[in-house]
Structures are given as structure tokens and as C-alpha cells.
């Protein structure tokens, strides 16, 4: 795993998206990504505004929203991202042939490539998924975009392990600029070959151990000590009557302190 600071890594990274995110994390002193699986744009924007000061990244599943609209969902979200200095990650999990994902990413109702700084994809269909998404990103926006490959998942019984995970890592080596890292539970290596992949880990919780639907939670210290750069927290921030401002501050502090311990610094 990397023991360099986010600031050091930002200066040397190949990807403009990764450079921006790492620099933001260093400046804002947060490695927290808020995962907001809610059904209305109003709730999404309300939580984004409350959690914004605590996060480096906001993760959406816009196909859950019953009232999605570019003008009333995306544009206000972008304004909040600018206000609070966080980036946007649409958790689309693309998993089709190159031409299909190119269209899914750039077209349709959501036009994800126009507004999401980061998205992600499965490797099951082969490297064409990377090529298709990269082509769409270039056509849809003047802003740089980044891709995370799904190497491991946090759900019980996931098939994303072993040879599959190793294959996804090899696939990521085909593109040093667009592929910025992985959704994974641990460090994926690559530094010996000149890669500095960001590791983002879902299923992080300080209280719950599971949800009864296969999700398995690990602690902040566990994942960061295993190589996680960004902790992804969802329901732990706002579910079950939790105060998102209080929980955002709590997870932010826990994540940052775990990171400082990993790089040998103290708060």
C-alpha cells in the first residue's frame, strides 16, 4: 500500500482527475465519500449540502431517483460541489461491450459523462469497456473524467475475487490516464510498474456489521490499514435517524486519523 501523503501523490499522478481528488483530500483533510442512495432530488441535494463540508467525493445512483432531471438535479448538485469543494462519482457499474457502454455513458436520460467526474465499470466484458467509456468521455465533456474498475465488492458471496480480481487489475494496466483505480477491499499493488491506483472501499461502518441483505461492514481502521484511500459510507451517515452533520464529522475524523497513522504522521 502507499505510505506517501495525498499531496505527494497528487503532484506525481498521471490522471488529472486523480490529481484533483488527491489535492482536494489533502487541502480539505478528508478521505470520506458519501454514498447517497435516496429516491428524490430534494433529499439528495439536502444531504449533499449538509455533508458537503465533510466529504471529498459524493457518490450517486441516479437511476434510483424518481424525479431525475439535468436542470433540477445535476446542475444544483454541481453548484453544491463547487460550494463545498467535493467531486461527483456516479456509481453506474457499467458492464457491457464497448459501443453499448459508450452510449450508456454519454446518452439517454442521465448523460453521465457530461457531469460525473468519476464512474466505474466491471471487467467481465473485457477491455472494450474501458475503451468505450474513454471515447465517450472525450466526446461528451471538455472536463477530465476518471474510471474505477470493480476489483472486489463488499457483499457476501461476491464472485469478484481470486483470478477475476487479478484479471481486472491486469486490464487496468492498459490505460494509465483514464483508469484511476479500483473499487476494492485492499491495496491492488501496481507501484512497481509505475501505477498509483486509488483504492475506494464501500461497506465501511463504525456501528453496524451488516444489513441483512448481504452487505458486510468493516471498520475505518481495518480498510485504511489494508490500503484504502477513500472510505465510502452510505447509510451510516443518515439512516436510522442519524444526524448527517454529526456522522459526517465523525467518519471524516476517523478516516483522516487512520490515514495519518498509515503514512506515519500524527494529527
Curated annotation (Swiss-Prot):
It catalyses: orotidine 5'-phosphate + H(+) = UMP + CO2. It comes from the Eukaryota. It is an enzyme of class 4 (lyase). PROSITE patterns: OMPDECASE. Substrate binds at residues 37, 59-61, 91-100, 217, 235. The keyword Transferase does not apply. Pathway: Pyrimidine metabolism; UMP biosynthesis via de novo pathway; UMP from orotate: step 2/2. InterPro entries: Aldolase_TIM, OMPdecase, OMPdecase_AS, OMPdeCOase_dom, RibuloseP-bd_barrel. SMART domains: OMPdecase. Keywords: Decarboxylase, Lyase, Pyrimidine biosynthesis. The keyword Nucleotide-binding does not apply. Its EC number is 4.1.1.23. GO terms for cellular component: cytosol. One of its GO terms (molecular function) is orotidine-5'-phosphate decarboxylase activity. Signal peptide: none annotated. The active site is at 93 (proton donor). Pfam families: OMPdecase. Belongs to the OMP decarboxylase family. This is Orotidine 5'-phosphate decarboxylase.
Amino acid at each position: 500500500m502507499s505510505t506517501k501523503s495525498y499531496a505527494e501523490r497528487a503532484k506525481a499522478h498521471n490522471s488529472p482527475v486523480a490529481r484533483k481528488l488527491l489535492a482536494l483530500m489533502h487541502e480539505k483533510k478528508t478521505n470520506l465519500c458519501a454514498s447517497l442512495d435516496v429516491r428524490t432530488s430534494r433529499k439528495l441535494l439536502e444531504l449533499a449540502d449538509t455533508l458537503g463540508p465533510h466529504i471529498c467525493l459524493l457518490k450517486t445512483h441516479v437511476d434510483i431517483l424518481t424525479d431525475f432531471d439535468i436542470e433540477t438535479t445535476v446542475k444544483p448538485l454541481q453548484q453544491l460541489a463547487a460550494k463545498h469543494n467535493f467531486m461527483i462519482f456516479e456509481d453506474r457499474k457499467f458492464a457491457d461491450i464497448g459501443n453499448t457502454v459508450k452510449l450508456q455513458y454519454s446518452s439517454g436520460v442521465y448523460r453521465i459523462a457530461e457531469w460525473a467526474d468519476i464512474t466505474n465499470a466491471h471487467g467481465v466484458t473485457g477491455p472494450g469497456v474501458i475503451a468505450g467509456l474513454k471515447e465517450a468521455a472525450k466526446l461528451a465533456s471538455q472536463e477530465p473524467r476518471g474510471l474505477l474498475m470493480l476489483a472486489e465488492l463488499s457483499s457476501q458471496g461476491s464472485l469478484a475475487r481470486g483470478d477475476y480480481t487479478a484479471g481486472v487489475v491486469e486490464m487496468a494496466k492498459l490505460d494509465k490516464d483514464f483508469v484511476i483505480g479500483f473499487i476494492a477491499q485492499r491495496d491492488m499493488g501496481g507501484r512497481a510498474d509505475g501505477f498509483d491506483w486509488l483504492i475506494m472501499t464501500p461497506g465501511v461502518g463504525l456501528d453496524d456489521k451488516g444489513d441483512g441483505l448481504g452487505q458486510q461492514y468493516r471498520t475505518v481502521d481495518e480498510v485504511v490499514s489494508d490500503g484504502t484511500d477513500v472510505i465510502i459510507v452510505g447509510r451510516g451517515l443518515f439512516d436510522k435517524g442519524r444526524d448527517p452533520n454529526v456522522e459526517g464529522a465523525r467518519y471524516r475524523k476517523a478516516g483522516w486519523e487512520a490515514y495519518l497513522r498509515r503514512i506515519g504522521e500524527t494529527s
